[in-house]
Each structure stands twice: as C-alpha cells, then as structure tokens.
Design a protein with these regions (language model features):
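N-terminal Rossmann-like FAD-binding beta1-loop-alpha1 element of flavoenzymes
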Residues: 1-2
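Conserved S-adenosyl-L-methionine
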Residues: 5-10
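Glycine-rich phosphate-binding loop and adjoining beta1-alpha1-beta2 segment
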Residues: 15-51
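Hydrophobic/aromatic anchor residues within beta-strands of the central parallel beta-sheet
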Residues: 56-58
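Conserved SAM/SAH-binding loop
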Residues: 60-67
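Short amphipathic alpha-helix with an adjacent loop that forms part of the alpha/beta core around
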Residues: 67-74
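E1/E1-like adenylate-forming module used to activate ubiquitin-like modifiers
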Residues: 78, 83-174
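Conserved small/polar residues in nucleotide/adenosyl-binding loops
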Residues: 176-178
C-alpha cells in the first residue's frame, strides 16, 4: 500500500496465501471482511482504490525454487521480499542478483514488539535475528556478499503460551462467527 501511495504505478503481487483471522493484528489488508480471500486480490483491490491507473498483476502462487521460472526479473525496477521461507528467499535473491535487479529482503519480525528497533542495513551487519543468520550462511555459500535487508535489533520475546495458530494448518475460521 505504501508503494502505491508513493506513486509506484506498476506492482506484481506474488502470494498463494489467504487472509486469516490471525493476520488482523499485523497486516493492513486483513480485516474481518477480507478473511478467507486471497491476499493478492485484497491488496490489488486496495491499490486500485488508491490509484485507479496502477497496473497490478497478481500471482496466486508461492515463490519457490520450483515456481521461480514464472518470473523474469530483468523487467523489474525493484523487488521487495516478504517471503516466509528460507528456500524461497534464497531463490528470489539469487534470481534478482542474476537479473541485476535491486532487492530488499525482510528478515524475522515474529515475537518482536518494538517498532523503533527496525533498521535497514546490509545482511552481513545484522545481529540477533535467527533468520538473518541462516540467510547469511546460505548466501555466503552462494557467493552473495551484499544484500539490503530490514530487520529488528530487538531480541525476540518469549510467547506467553504455545497457542500459535496457523491458518494453513489449523483454520479457525469455522469456529468464529465473523
């Protein structure tokens, strides 16, 4: 949404996920009305409400090494990564680098509550982030020596209980009247 409000006129949205009730506390597109809808469709509609002239292409697929061939990043001006899996992130970074397309990757934000602890830096300057550590190790093996990332310097908090719910594995939509 921020990109559309900033005047970016062409966006490709790639995600096979649907809005889940558990997304409402942290994702701007997630509302009670959008639960169950594809995130890319909800985002595209909102972007078109902001800028009716925007060109928005949606892809209901997860970006993985197996689906990467569907995308030619040589025609992209910039890539913003928010993939949840290490394998998807690595494939995206490697393909962006091969296409010489600038990329910024999001690192782990789970169990973090201090918005002032986020910063944009190079992957190799990050600390305390388990995802960044894995990405550093994997990308170093592949010869990637520089990558712009956003990450939090905050140590993750320990959840109060183990009630983490994922709509992929335990959909609670049928249990709740919306």
């Amino acid at each position: 949404e921020a990109l559309a409000r900033s005047g970016v006129g062409s966006l490709d949205l790639i995600d096979d996920d649907k809005v889940c009730l558990t997304n409402i506390n942290r994702q701007i597109y997630a509302t009670r009305k959008t639960v169950g809808q594809y995130k890319v469709d909800v985002a595209a509609e909102r972007i078109k409400d902001i800028n009716p002239d925007a060109v928005v292409r949606t892809y209901k697929t997860f970006y993985t090494p197996e689906t990467a061939d569907q995308f030619d990043f040589k025609h992209y001006d910039y890539i913003v990564d928010a993939i949840d899996t290490v394998t998807g992130k690595i494939a995206l970074v490697m393909n962006a680098k091969a296409a010489k397309t600038p990329i910024i990757c999001s690192m782990g934000a789970g169990n973090k509550v201090d918005p002032t602890a986020f910063e944009v830096t190079d992957l190799y300057k990050t600390s305390v982030c388990p995802l960044a550590k894995v990405m550093r190790n994997e990308l170093k093996k592949r010869g990637v020596r520089k990558l712009k990332v956003v990450y939090s310097k905050e140590l993750p908090i320990t959840p109060v209980d183990d009630m983490a719910i994922s709509c992929r594995t335990h959909c609670i939509l049928s249990l709740i009247h919306i």
